[in-house]
């Protein structure tokens, strides 16, 4: 079947069930096809019929509608139609229709058909002229109609805003600007970058072969940064080479990104100890929220001015024979994330119950009504205004029940999903990994997904890839390795959303050990109250974790590995598990006994005693998932009692 993208495709306007539809005229289709969303009297056939379409493929059809009324230019036509989901069209006029109402004549801008005689509606039999519509015209009309709808909706929204919504809009306008050093930026703090050895000169020779494109882009970009006061010409003895990168994100933006190699400077300077918040701790904070807003600090780092003594350290070289230094905190310094996170944490101090920042991304979250959420958002905006923090208006997303944040999509029903761009990056890697660096990047991307809890038993699948990263092992890549990478990528294409538990949900963890790997999953038992039925409990998957036992741990007995798997899983989710009782499910009756009976503190069992003491801090109710009737459970319980 031809697609709507074919500029020569023929469409005519028809009316079915009083709804006007752009129907595709397909001389290669055996019979008329309709999308299931068109409400016809569908009848399931005893056996499917096979139809051929224009691309020569054959498909099975199970539902058919007889005597479908199709109105064209106020003339009634009738034809049998079958239901097909994958046609890509609302309605396709096939050969059964064209043969029934022949002669069928097709011109450049029209088609002609013979309308049938219908005495019931006084319709004569006659040839009718039907103008055709091309896909480009359909698209033009659709865009125009959509634009009109959007403009009307914006007009209605603007005139129907509540006083609170208007206040939020006006305050957002006041704190937004495209220039991070606008007069709105009233921050007077000056950032210091200090050398470990103040006498050291950090000067990296620039031996990069620049292209003519590089020279032109550096000239334009640096001139713009000088004009904005972001950089200035320098006579510093320090220098780092600048270059352009064009990775996946840059290709999507259609703009290359300037990068400065501050590797030598980072080795020579004192770091910053302020830590970035962990993603899991962020998710713990926002659990149970049903309204979200995100704000973005405009060119975040650039809102912090450098101390005059620190500016020369940031000097960089680029063509054509230029030497600049930064007036603001540049990207690429090892101290930059910690410095900026500290800046944001101080500015938003006291708002932690409904607001958090991850570097330059701000998330406002509430479990409340929309109005209450907007009230909290207004507090955050007014704080930004007070502190002179400039935001990006085009990146502000206000009062949503589903929102993207840090590579995740947060939903008000408690589910979280990976954003598509994260999986796109993984898909870009070839199956046949070329070298160690590419393998490191692949595993790093995979770890990002695994750390969010989306991958089940991923350690078992990647355990043979990690040794290849080590330079002590000769590089070798086999067809089996390529097959494994392909399998992992396929697995990542179909990741189920995870549930983020509410405070009132009861938590369950399930653990297992197998050979040299361990795995666990976290579930939440959610109590539902469906209308007209009894209350029911539904277990929802929250996240997975897994790992590889160390070489020493791999020598442990099966029972010890099962116990250690439970401990490692509880350590991983300690923050979620410690506050209240939860259930630990295991298929090891040994672990059940381990949790119930105290060990004797003797030198033969020192490791197990330490594990049991650690176990005691968790309010776990251990459940043997194979049931109490398992004879091994009784045997092992007696074994524990004798110790």
Swiss-Prot record:
It catalyses: DNA(n) + a 2'-deoxyribonucleoside 5'-triphosphate = DNA(n+1) + diphosphate. SUPFAM superfamilies: Acid proteases, DNA/RNA polymerases. The keyword Ribonucleoprotein does not apply. Keywords: Aspartyl protease, Endonuclease, Hydrolase, Magnesium, Metal-binding, Multifunctional enzyme, Nuclease, Nucleotidyltransferase, Protease, RNA-binding, RNA-directed DNA polymerase, Transferase. GO terms for biological process: proteolysis. The active site is at 26 (for protease activity). The keyword Calcium does not apply. Residues 6-209 form the Peptidase A3A domain. GO terms for molecular function: aspartic-type endopeptidase activity; endonuclease activity; metal ion binding; RNA binding; RNA-directed DNA polymerase activity. Residues 226-410 form the Reverse transcriptase domain. Gene3D superfamilies: 3.30.70.270, Acid Proteases (2.40.70.10), HIV Type 1 Reverse Transcriptase, subunit A, domain 1 (3.10.10.10), Ribonuclease H-like superfamily/Ribonuclease H (3.30.420.10). InterPro entries: DNA/RNA_pol_sf, Pept_A3A, Peptidase_aspartic_dom_sf, Rev_trsase/Diguanyl_cyclase, RNaseH_sf, RT_dom, RT_RNaseH, Viral_Replic_Matur_Polypro. Its EC number is 3.4.23.-, 2.7.7.49. Mg(2+) binds at residues 296, 360-361. The polymerase/reverse transcriptase (RT) and ribonuclease H (RH) domains are structured in five subdomains: finger, palm, thumb, connection and RNase H. Within the palm subdomain, the 'primer grip' region is thought to be involved in the positioning of the primer terminus for accommodating the incoming nucleotide. The RH domain stabilizes the association of RT with primer-template. Belongs to the caulimoviridae enzymatic polyprotein family. Encodes for at least two polypeptides: protease (PR) and reverse transcriptase (RT). The protease processes the polyprotein in cis. Reverse transcriptase is multifunctional enzyme that converts the viral RNA genome into dsDNA in viral cytoplasmic capsids. This enzyme displays a DNA polymerase activity that can copy either DNA or RNA templates, and a ribonuclease H (RNase H) activity that cleaves the RNA strand of RNA-DNA heteroduplexes in a partially processive 3'- to 5'-endonucleasic mode. This is Enzymatic polyprotein. It comes from Cestrum yellow leaf curling virus (CmYLCV).
């Amino acid at each position: 079947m031809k697609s709507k993208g074919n500029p020569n495709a023929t469409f005519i306007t028809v009316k079915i069930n009083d709804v006007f539809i752009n129907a595709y005229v397909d001389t290669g289709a055996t019979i008329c096809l309709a999308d299931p969303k068109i409400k016809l009297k569908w009848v399931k056939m005893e056996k499917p019929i096979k139809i051929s379409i224009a691309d020569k493929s054959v498909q099975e059809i199970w539902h058919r509608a007889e005597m479908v009324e199709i109105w064209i230019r106020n003339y009634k036509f009738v034809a049998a139609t079958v239901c097909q989901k994958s046609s890509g069209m609302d309605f396709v006029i096939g050969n059964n229709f064209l043969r029934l109402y022949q002669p069928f004549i097709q011109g450049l801008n029209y088609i002609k058909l013979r309308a049938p005689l219908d005495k019931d509606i006084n319709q004569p039999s006659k040839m009718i002229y039907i103008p055709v519509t091309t896909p480009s015209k359909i698209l033009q009309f659709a865009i125009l109609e959509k634009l009109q709808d959007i403009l009307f909706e914006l007009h209605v929204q603007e005139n129907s805003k509540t006083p609170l919504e208007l206040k939020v809009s006006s305050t957002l306008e006041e704190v937004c600007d495209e220039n991070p050093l606008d007069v709105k930026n009233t921050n007077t703090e000056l950032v210091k970058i200090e050398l470990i050895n103040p006498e050291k000169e950090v000067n990296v020779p620039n031996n990069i072969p620049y292209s003519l494109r590089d020279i032109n882009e550096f000239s334009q970009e640096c001139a713009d940064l000088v004009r904005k006061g972001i950089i200035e010409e320098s006579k510093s003895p320090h220098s780092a080479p600048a270059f352009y990168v064009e990775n996946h994100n840059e290709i999507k933006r259609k703009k290359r990104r300037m990068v400065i190699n501050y590797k030598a400077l980072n080795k020579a300077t004192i770091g910053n100890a302020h830590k970035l918040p962990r993603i899991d701790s962020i998710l713990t904070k926002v659990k149970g929220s049903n309204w979200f807003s995100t704000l973005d600090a405009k060119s975040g780092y650039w809102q912090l001015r450098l101390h005059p003594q620190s500016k020369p350290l940031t000097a960089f070289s680029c063509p054509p024979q230029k030497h600049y230094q930064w007036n603001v905190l540049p990207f690429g310094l090892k101290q930059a994330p910690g410095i900026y996170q500290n800046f944001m944490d101080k500015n938003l101090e006291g708002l932690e119950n409904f607001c958090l920042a991850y570097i330059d991304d701000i998330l406002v979250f509430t479990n409340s009504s929309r109005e209450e959420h907007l009230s909290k958002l207004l507090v955050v905006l007014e704080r930004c205004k007070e502190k002179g923090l400039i935001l990006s208006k085009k990146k502000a997303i206000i009062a949503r029940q589903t929102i993207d944040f840090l590579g995740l999509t947060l939903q008000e029903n408690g589910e979280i999903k990976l954003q598509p761009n994260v999986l796109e990056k993984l898909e870009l890697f070839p199956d046949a990994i070329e070298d160690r660096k590419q393998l490191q990047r692949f595993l790093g991307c995979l770890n990002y997904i695994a750390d969010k809890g989306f991958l089940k038993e991923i350690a078992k699948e990647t355990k043979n890839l990690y040794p290849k990263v080590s330079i002590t092992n000769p590089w070798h890549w086999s067809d089996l390795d390529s097959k494994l990478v392909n399998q992992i990528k396929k697995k990542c294409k179909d990741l189920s959303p995870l549930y983020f538990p509410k405070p009132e949900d009861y938590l369950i963890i399930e653990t297992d050990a197998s050979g040299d790997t361990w795995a666990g999953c976290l579930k939440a038992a959610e109590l539902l109250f469906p209308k007209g039925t009894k209350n029911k409990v539904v277990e929802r998957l929250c996240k997975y974790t897994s790992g590889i036992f160390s070489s020493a741990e791999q020598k442990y007995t099966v029972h010890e590995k099962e116990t250690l798997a439970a401990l490692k899983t509880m350590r991983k989710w300690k923050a979620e598990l410690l506050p209240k009782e939860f259930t630990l499910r295991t298929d090891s009756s040994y672990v059940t006994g381990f949790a119930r009976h105290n060990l004797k503190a003797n030198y033969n069992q020192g490791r197990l005693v330490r594990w049991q003491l650690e176990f005691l801090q968790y309010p776990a109710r251990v459940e043997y998932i194979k049931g109490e009737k398992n004879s091994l459970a009784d045997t092992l319980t007696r074994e524990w009692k004798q110790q």
